[in-house]
């Protein structure tokens, strides 16, 4: 099974899915950013940390028990990184960045990082090229990290686009596996900033039309479970609801998993408890989805 993932929602699910199914992951890289000379791939790192079970499961980013000595020391020296980067997390960024500077691809660097953390599943970036999710606000354009991390999602959003997406290509390693894959699960990540960038790489969306595709809605009622998904969906003209999520994936989606609160809101949907507060919740949801694929 192929799983499409961003940095929130889906990593929780993957902790459960690894107990019940074999899978590989293609991860959004449109939120990647260079900080202090190192390439940060927040969504890839969250996926790896979650599967390795070292993720800070209170914030759902970074590493559990991390310290921030380097970040704080830089601040004392008069340099503000903008993002609060943990010391252990920074080691991941350094490993990746040194490999990239040595001429390795992002796919190769991601494989090395995953293996270093003991992750057996294959994790791939959506592309090798630099793509940046850009949020058009009432205060001007800003990188998604600036909008969400520095500004806490406060500015009014007018539009969202992916700078550089026209040059992005599906990695050969992903093309080969995708050609053979029959089942695709779109995790409960932000449809606009986590999943849409992946679907916008070359002809990725078209390649899903002959697959069995199930998506899990990150919207319950009219609210996002976490993050700014609602605000961003409205900006792109989608209804903030499970139906709006289905509309984003309309041309290839076979079935949408919605929360029990949204039971019966639309055809081609099935309801269960989609809120994952514990690993047991994640295992239960993963088992539910795996059985759905068997019935498609």
From Swiss-Prot:
Pathway: Cofactor biosynthesis; coenzyme F420 biosynthesis. Its EC number is 2.7.8.28. 7,8-didemethyl-8-hydroxy-5-deazariboflavin binds at residues 45, 84. It comes from the Archaea. Keywords: Magnesium, Transferase. InterPro entries: CofD, CofD-like_dom_sf, FbiA/CofD. GO terms for biological process: F420-0 metabolic process. One of its GO terms (molecular function) is magnesium ion binding. It is an enzyme of class 2 (transferase). CDD domains: CofD_like. It catalyses: (2S)-lactyl-2-diphospho-5'-guanosine + 7,8-didemethyl-8-hydroxy-5-deazariboflavin = oxidized coenzyme F420-0 + GMP + H(+). SUPFAM superfamilies: CofD-like. Its cofactor is Mg(2+). The keyword Repeat does not apply. The keyword Zinc does not apply. PANTHER family: 2-PHOSPHO-L-LACTATE TRANSFERASE (PTHR43007:SF1). Homodimer. NCBIfam families: F420_cofD. Belongs to the CofD family. Catalyzes the transfer of the 2-phospholactate moiety from (2S)-lactyl-2-diphospho-5'-guanosine to 7,8-didemethyl-8-hydroxy-5-deazariboflavin (FO) with the formation of oxidized coenzyme F420-0 and GMP. This is 2-phospho-L-lactate transferase. It comes from Archaeoglobus fulgidus (strain ATCC 49558 / DSM 4304 / JCM 9628 / NBRC 100126 / VC-16). The lineage of its organism: Archaea, Methanobacteriati, Methanobacteriota, Archaeoglobi, Archaeoglobales. The gene is cofD.
